[in-house]
UniProtKB/Swiss-Prot annotation:
Example of a GO biological process term: dTDP biosynthetic process
Gene: tmk
Cross-referenced InterPro entries: P-loop_NTPase, Thymidylate_kin-like_dom, Thymidylate_kinase
Family per similarity comment: Belongs to the thymidylate kinase family.
Keyword check for Kinase: yes
HAMAP family reported for this sequence: Thymidylate_kinase (MF_00165)
Record protein name field: Thymidylate kinase
Function: Phosphorylation of dTMP to form dTDP in both de novo and salvage pathways of dTTP synthesis.
One family name in Pfam for this protein: Thymidylate_kin
Organism (species): Dechloromonas aromatica (strain RCB)
Keywords, alphabetical: ATP-binding, Kinase, Nucleotide biosynthesis, Nucleotide-binding, Transferase
Catalyzed reaction equations: dTMP + ATP = dTDP + ADP
Length: 204
């Protein structure tokens, strides 16, 4: 039996990452083998590319190609083998993030994105994507309060992040059966109740 592939998405400051390990723990309590990973990253090569992607200035197409190169390695080394063994993968960001950040935020031609997506992972898509959405001003306030060094995406202007958010919502509108939008501007307890309900209904 093929495993399940769940991804977490959302603008910077949406708080999605704090729920990734929680969901993995919940699934492990049910006896499911779960791999927690992230993009860019997830493999030794992917983590090296992550450092470049998050910190080095580069041409849009270079950035996009490196994202997909890291993803191909990630799929080949971790995601596809785990799913083939019947294990689950919970990933912090995947291809929807490239659609939102490079496509929406940076203005990459959508046709180029779709061609790369098809080439790199064919028909493989997450079984479920949890999109954490909240007003941009709330997200920016959370980032400021975190008081940490920001990567190059987090340092982008407000209009960039608004385009990213709208691209995410557009993607969710076109794939409503896969992408479930979570109101991230509510209590952690309520968010986790909603996550458990969605995963139980859609994947278990």
């Amino acid at each position: 039996m093929k495993g399940k592939f769940i991804t977490f998405e959302g603008i910077d400051g949406a708080g999605k990452s704090s729920h990734v390990e929680w969901l993995a723990g919940l699934l492990r309590q049910r006896g499911i083998v779960v791999h927690v990973t992230r993009e860019p990253g997830g493999t030794e090569l992917g983590e090296k590319l992550r450092e470049l992607l998050l910190n080095e200035p580069m041409h849009l197409e270079t950035e996009t190609l490196l994202m997909f190169a890291a993803r191909r390695e990630h799929l080949a080394r971790l995601i596809e083998p785990a799913l083939a063994r019947g294990e689950w993968v919970v990933c912090d960001r995947f291809s929807d993030a490239t659609y939102a950040y490079q496509g929406g935020g940076r203005g990459l031609d959508r046709a180029k994105f779709l061609a790369l997506e098809h080439w790199v992972h064919g028909h493989l898509q997450p079984d479920l994507t949890l999109l954490f959405d909240l007003p941009l001003d709330v997200a920016r306030e959370r980032i400021v309060l975190a008081n940490r060094v920001l990567d190059k995406f987090e340092q982008e202007r407000v209009d960039f992040h608004e385009r990213v958010r709208q691209a995410y919502l557009e993607r969710a509108h076109t794939s409503p059966s896969r992408i479930r939008v979570i109101d991230a501007n509510q209590s952690i307890e309520n968010i986790r109740k909603q996550l458990e309900q969605i995963v139980s209904t859609d994947c278990l």
